Amino acid sequence: MRIKVGLKCEECGDINYSTYKNSKNTTEKLELKKYCPRLKKHTFHKEVKLKS
C-alpha cells in the first residue's frame, strides 16, 4: 500500500517535499539529501507523516 509522506529538512525544520512510499517494501524511514530553498543548499531530509 502506498502512503503519502513529507520530507522535512533536518536543519531548518521545513517540510519542503512530499512523495509517496510503498510501506510494505520500504519499512524504514526515508532519508534523502535534497535542496532546501530556505537555506539555499543541499541538506538531509527525513520522512514525516502528512495529515490526509
From Swiss-Prot:
One of its GO terms (molecular function) is structural constituent of ribosome. One of its GO terms (cellular component) is ribonucleoprotein complex. Pfam families: Ribosomal_L33 (PF00471). Disulfide bonds: none annotated. Keywords: Ribonucleoprotein, Ribosomal protein. The keyword Membrane does not apply. PROSITE patterns: RIBOSOMAL_L33. SUPFAM superfamilies: Zn-binding ribosomal proteins (SSF57829). One of its GO terms (biological process) is translation. HAMAP family: Ribosomal_bL33 (MF_00294). NCBIfam families: PRK00504.1 (NF001764), PRK00595.1 (NF001860), rpmG_bact (TIGR01023). PANTHER family: 50S RIBOSOMAL PROTEIN L33, CHLOROPLASTIC (PTHR43168), LARGE RIBOSOMAL SUBUNIT PROTEIN BL33A (PTHR43168:SF6). Belongs to the bacterial ribosomal protein bL33 family. This is Large ribosomal subunit protein bL33. It comes from Campylobacter jejuni subsp. doylei (strain ATCC BAA-1458 / RM4099 / 269.97). The gene is rpmG.
